[in-house]
Structures are given as C-alpha cells and as structure tokens.
Design a protein with these regions (language model features):
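N-terminal export and membrane-targeting signals
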Residues: 2-26, 131
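Glycine/small-residue-rich loop that forms an oxyanion/phosphate-binding "nest" at active or ligand-binding sites
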Residues: 119, 148, 152
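Penicillin-recognizing serine hydrolase domain
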Residues: 2, 12-15, 33-52, 58-83, ...
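Short, well-structured active-site flanking segments
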Residues: 121-137, 142, 156, 206
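Active-site SXXK
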Residues: 93, 104-127, 138, 273
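Short, conserved catalytic-motif segment at the N-terminal edge
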Residues: 80-83, 88-104
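Hydrophobic alpha-helical membrane segments, chiefly transmembrane helices and signal peptide h-regions
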Residues: 23-24, 28-31, 110-119, 271, ...
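Acidic/histidine-rich, surface-exposed loop or edge segments in extracytoplasmic proteins
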Residues: 43-57, 94-99, 114-119, 140-144
Length: 304
C-alpha cells in the first residue's frame, strides 16, 4: 500500500477493509496487511435462519476459552493490542466465542453498514439505481468519498441516532465530531446485532443489496488497501460476506474484521463473526492485519 496521507477534517482517516485504536506514528511507513486467500465460496443473498430452541449447538469448547486463545494469538503478533470478540451461531443463537463483547471500539468503516441501512431505508421499498450503485461501492470497496456524501445527506449523527433506535443497539454512540463518521463507537455485541438485523429484519431488497456487496468485497479497497485480512484470509475455505474497518488517528490504530460466515450452501450466513481491535501506535498495517488473521484462524475448526 502506498503511504497513507493525513485526511482533511472531512476525511482525515486512513482505513483498511473490514469491522481497535492507538496513535499511528509515521503513517507513511505503513503498508497494507498481508493477504493470502485468493478466493472464497460464494453464495447468493438469503435470510439467515431464526434461532430455534430445538437446535443443539455442536460447540463443546468453552466460549471464553476460544476467545482467549484468539486474543493470545492476536497479542502475540501485535503486543499491547486490545481485542473485542463476539462470534454467534445465528441458527441457534449460541455464542461461539466472546471476550470484551460490551467494550466500545471505534467503528472505522464498519459504520458504513449503518449508513447503508439508513440510506436505503429512506428510499422505501426500492432504492433508485444511482443510490443502489453508491451503497454497493461504499460497502464492497469501502469507498470513503461515497460514505462522506451519504453521511452528510443523511444528517451526519442523525444516521446513528435513527439506526440505534431501529435496531435497538445498546452501546453505539455517534462521534463527537459530526464530520468524522469513523469515530462512531460501538461494541462487538452491537455489531452482531447489526448483522442480525440485516439478515432477519431489513426489507428483502435492502438485505440482498447489502449482503451482495459484502459477499463481493473487493480485495483492493477504493483507497488501495488490501481488505483481505482477518475473516477473508483466515476463513478462505468458507463462504463469507464482510465489512472491514481500519483507521489511523494520532492516538490509536483501529483494525476491525466483521462479517457473516457460512459452512454450507444452505446456510451461507450462519455465523456472525466480529473482531474489533485497538492496536499500539506505530503498528504497521502488515503486522496489524496478520494479527487479526492469526486470531480468526483459530475459529476455523469451531465453525462447522
């Protein structure tokens, strides 16, 4: 990745694809996260199954143990990183891994999920082609310029207020600086709730557009960043639909990998996987991305 430039007050962020925090010193020296997966199983948009009491969760390993193993792997690769994890089986409602699930982290580009839901919702049952194209590009390529346009058009922080109320989010708060959508705060648990809303509650047209864009996430983002860290690299043999997030501030580095993961064609979005991280100042993008990939790799055997 080329040197990351400081953004203006409207767009001073440097993002990495998909859903932590610490100052980035000498950003120009940072590169994009290493990525090895070249493809993933693709499945068309579809509604995730509702949780049912009759379905048993085939996951004998402790929820905390898996999350702690993930944290250990991430911190071994990037010492000093704070991690929030929430992984849920949407078919049963069972938690697979959870750690610091109620701790707030910056969303970075993960907030584009809320921008997309609000934008499409404002247009009723069917969005116009131009808006649909913009939302798709904003999500699949994590396009910041389009996010800026839709954020302003939607009333900035009013977008967060509306979506918090619509989804019932409990710990997602709008940024203090209304121009900086990436500084929205959320928790791993709230991001899981956002994915649950997309798959079970959002109108069919909205759901299909968003899931299609996430499923077709480009390896190279609009800003030139390699988005295939965390979920895409670690779970390359499974189907996935992801929204990654990355952001460099003077005080922190945020790197998030979030999405829906499937293990069979009939359940392409069975697992909601959310890993948010705050990594130390000066952590390079290759190190930061590889750290999340190392952690998420440990989920491969648990997601059956």
């Amino acid at each position: 990745m080329s040197s990351i430039q400081a953004r203006t007050p409207r767009a001073r962020w440097s993002w990495i694809a998909t859903g932590g925090l610490v100052a980035v010193v000498a950003l120009s020296a940072l590169g994009a996260p290493a990525a090895f997966a070249t493809s993933h199983d693709q499945a068309g948009p579809g509604r995730a199954p509702e949780a049912t009491a009759a379905m048993a969760a085939p996951h004998p390993i402790s929820v905390t143990a898996i999350a702690q193993q993930m944290q250990t792997a991430i911190q071994a690769a990037s010492p000093g990183t704070t991690v929030g994890i929430d992984v849920v089986d949407t078919a049963t409602g069972t938690a697979i891994a959870s750690l610091n699930a109620d701790q707030q982290f910056y969303t970075a580009s993960v907030v584009k999920l809320l921008i997309a839901l609000d934008t499409l919702g404002s247009q009723g049952a069917q969005s116009d082609p131009d808006t649909a194209t913009k939302v798709t590009q904003m999500l699949s390529a994590s396009d910041d310029d389009i996010a800026d346009q839709l954020w302003e058009a939607g009333g900035d922080n009013a977008i967060i207020d509306r979506m918090v109320a619509a989804i019932g989010l409990t710990a997602t708060t709008a940024p203090e600086d209304t121009a900086q959508w990436g500084e929205t705060l959320t928790t791993p648990r709230d991001v899981v709730a956002i994915f649950r809303y997309i798959t079970t509650t959002a109108p069919a047209a909205t759901r299909d557009l968003i899931l299609g864009a996430l499923r077709d996430a480009a390896r190279t983002a609009a800003d030139g960043t390699d988005q295939f860290f965390g979920i895409p690299d670690a779970l390359a043999r499974k189907s996935w639909a992801v929204k990654q997030g990355w952001m460099g501030l003077n005080s922190s580095t945020t790197l998030d990998t979030t999405g829906l993961v499937g293990t069979s064609p009939d359940q392409p979005y069975r697992y909601a996987v959310v890993v948010l991280s705050t990594q130390p100042a000066g952590t390079s993008w290759p190190v930061a991305g590889a750290a999340l990939t190392a952690g998420v790799t440990l989920l491969d055997a648990a997601l059956k």
